[in-house]
């Protein structure tokens, strides 16, 4: 039975706030402060979240970062991360493990997220007006601790549908994320 392998942890949807990056989180960008970074300390560690070919990633996993005051209380890898920056939804990590401790790669890079590479995508065209569209559910903004929980899988599906509309060239990956979320919903209704 195929379903035996399904992760038993319930699906959790987390909207996580990250520092803006005009290079789509594929390399360091200097736009956040308007001047060059001084030393390794100030580089936002999320700068490489969507540098999928970075040698630090494996064939199937991408290593990313989000700054949490305290990490979300989730187990396993049945977690969707919806990345949020400057009021916009900018991308997704699917089937993500969230580590309790940040792991340093070198003095510039570290990670606390391990996501499934073929369920991870940055949106060339970002989603804005997210509160008006109901994408934050009842929240007025993403929590000060760096993230908030979204409670309804339908919210994620609605966000992904808009992402596909705005980014048809990323439809394959976005549909895969949707399929995964929808398969989780069927699990819980059995």
Regions found by a protein language model. Give the residues of each.
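Structured alpha/beta reader/binder surfaces that contact nucleic acids or chromatin modification marks
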Residues: 31-133
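Contiguous surface segments at macromolecular interaction interfaces
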Residues: 2-43, 102-190
């Amino acid at each position: 039975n195929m379903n035996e392998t399904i992760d038993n942890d319930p699906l959790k949807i987390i909207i996580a706030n990250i520092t803006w990056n005009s290079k789509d989180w594929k390399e360091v960008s200097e736009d956040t402060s308007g001047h060059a970074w001084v030393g390794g300390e100030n580089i936002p560690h999320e700068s490489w979240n969507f540098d999928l070919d970075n040698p630090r990633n494996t064939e199937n996993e991408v290593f990313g970062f989000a700054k949490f005051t305290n990490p979300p209380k989730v187990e396993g890898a049945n977690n969707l991360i919806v990345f949020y920056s400057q009021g916009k939804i900018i991308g997704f990590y699917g089937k993500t493990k969230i580590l309790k401790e940040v792991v340093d790669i070198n003095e510039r890079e570290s990670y606390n997220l391990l996501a499934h590479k073929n369920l991870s995508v940055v949106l060339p065209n970002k989603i804005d007006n997210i509160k008006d569209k109901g994408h934050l559910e009842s929240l007025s903004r993403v929590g000060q601790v760096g993230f908030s929980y979204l409670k309804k899988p339908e919210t994620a599906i609605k966000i992904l549908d808009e992402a596909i509309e705005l980014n048809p060239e990323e439809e394959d990956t976005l549909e895969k994320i949707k399929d995964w979320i929808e398969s989780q919903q069927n699990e819980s209704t059995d």
